[in-house]
Amino acid sequence: MALMVLMALVGCSTPPPVQKAQRVKVDPLRSLNMEALCKDQAAKRYNTGEQKIDVTAFEQFQGSYEMRGYTFRKEQFVCSFDADGHFLHLSMR
């Protein structure tokens, strides 16, 4: 009986393997196209030129991408893309 309890405890004491998020390298051409589309959409939303839009961050999630940026007036926004890089929406922050 003690042997069975000991074996049960040994099985419980081993920590589960650490899972790490998979990072897929984004094609540079795709990310440049996404940035251009984000700048275009932000310029339309904020009624300004694309040259006055700065994209400052690019984040990859499990099934989507986000690009963060701001206008020359320091208005912040986030562009969201699906897993294939298609534009979903622009959120003002």
UniProtKB/Swiss-Prot annotation:
Main location per the UniProt record: membrane
InterPro entries: YsaB-like
Recorded topology in the membrane: Lipid-anchor
Gene Ontology CC entries for this record: plasma membrane
Assigned keywords, A-Z: Cell membrane, Lipoprotein, Membrane, Palmitate, Signal
Protein name: Uncharacterized lipoprotein YsaB
Lipidation (N-palmitoyl cysteine): C12
Signal sequence annotation: 1-11
Pfam families on file: YsaB
Name of the gene encoding the protein in the UniProt record: ysaB
Lipidated positions per record (S-diacylglycerol cysteine): C12
Localization, UniProt: Cell membrane
